[in-house]
Amino acid sequence: MEKLLGQAMPLGCIMVDLESTTLQPHEKERLLDPLVAGVILFSRNYESIEQLQALTTEIHQLRHPKLLIAVDHEGGRVQRFKEGFSMLPAMGQLGKCFRANEKEGLELAQQVGWLMATELLAVGVDFSFAPVVDLDYGDSRVIGDRAFDSDPVIVGKLGKALVQGMRDAGMASVAKHFPGHGYIQADTHLEVAVDHREFQEIAHKDIQPFLKLIENGLDAVMPAHVRYPKVDDLPAGFSKVWLQEVLRQQCYFDGAIISDDMSMHAATEFGDAPTRVTAALKAGCDLVLVCNDPVAADEVLSQVTWETGPLSHARLIRLHGKGHLKLSQLHNNPLWQSRASHVSHFLNSVNQQGLLV
């Protein structure tokens, strides 16, 4: 059957990526597959504000309900779009600000969340995979200053403030990487990661910031591609123990569970891409990322059989952005001007003090 543009089709369960700054014909065809739920964008997909808005508009016009468009736009070293966007501080810098002055730290975190979300929503991006609420134990190469702090109470407070800013702007939040990625040194993009701690230690420390956000209506969680063998032999993103028993039943989380990228090395030991995706879905993920490997993405779409249930679909629909400002209004908006200036001033002061990592 010929696929028609703008056709009514429920969201699926797979998030894919794009090769460049424009949507190619074969990519349009891929995005019209019923299994697809959305697109994750990277730096390679960004050339200019105008180009990005044209790209997101084209993606959103393909289907109804609209495909989700997401990006990793945390701040610091993980900010996919730079020129034309406000530079955002690393979360670790917000943690230092909090320790110097709690009130100022919380206010700044809320403003950073609002600024990040407002600018992305204005160009058609639905949500950012943020905040990182891992704890900074000082040894993790991949987490480091992406984390607010080592103290779970501080991380919970700052995460809550950042999420509130995102929510005020109309953006859903995705807390990562459950149940905690900060303790281990390994980078799961490159290698298998194992955390040998007991469940009680993880629960009393790393899970606490997630609980704080769940209490305040967290929209989504991304599990870690990390093994915790004292709890389950499977990495959290493939584990019914972590996703169903701990996250759903013990933490009372009812939002979306979004897997980390199935192409990361830590996931590849579980068979080919269709096998990995199916395992993650069966474990309890509502949405699975397949990035940086278009062959694997097409294998998944042709071989995986999965029907998104009404509850999963509702969870994903809630991730659609609800921005209040259009791009043409943004720079003339007094609130944007004030918050962009405040965040820029903070970054300048950090640079002057030599606190940048």
UniProtKB/Swiss-Prot annotation:
Leader sequence segment: none
Molecular function terms from GO: beta-N-acetylhexosaminidase activity
Keyword Cell division: yes
Pathway per the UniProt entry: Cell wall biogenesis; peptidoglycan recycling
Listed EC numbers: 3.2.1.52
Site location (Important for catalytic activity): D187
Positions contributing to substrate binding: D72, R80, R146, K176, H177
Pfam family, one: Glyco_hydro_3
Catalytic machinery residues: H189, D260
Top-level class of the enzyme under EC nomenclature: hydrolase
Catalytic activity: Hydrolysis of terminal non-reducing N-acetyl-D-hexosamine residues in N-acetyl-beta-D-hexosaminides
Cellular location(s): Cytoplasm
InterPro entries: Beta_hexosaminidase_bac, Glyco_hydro_3_N, Glyco_hydro_3_N_sf, Glycoside_hydrolase_SF, NagZ_Beta-hexosaminidase
GO terms under biological process: carbohydrate metabolic process; cell division; cell wall organization; peptidoglycan biosynthetic process; peptidoglycan turnover; regulation of cell shape
One CC-aspect GO term: cytoplasm
Family: Belongs to the glycosyl hydrolase 3 family. NagZ subfamily.
Matches recorded under HAMAP family: NagZ
Function as written in the Swiss-Prot or TrEMBL entry: Plays a role in peptidoglycan recycling by cleaving the terminal beta-1,4-linked N-acetylglucosamine (GlcNAc) from peptide-linked peptidoglycan fragments, giving rise to free GlcNAc, anhydro-N-acetylmuramic acid and anhydro-N-acetylmuramic acid-linked peptides.
Protein name per its UniProtKB record: Beta-hexosaminidase
Species: Hydrogenovibrio crunogenus (strain DSM 25203 / XCL-2) (Thiomicrospira crunogena)
Gene name of the encoded protein: nagZ
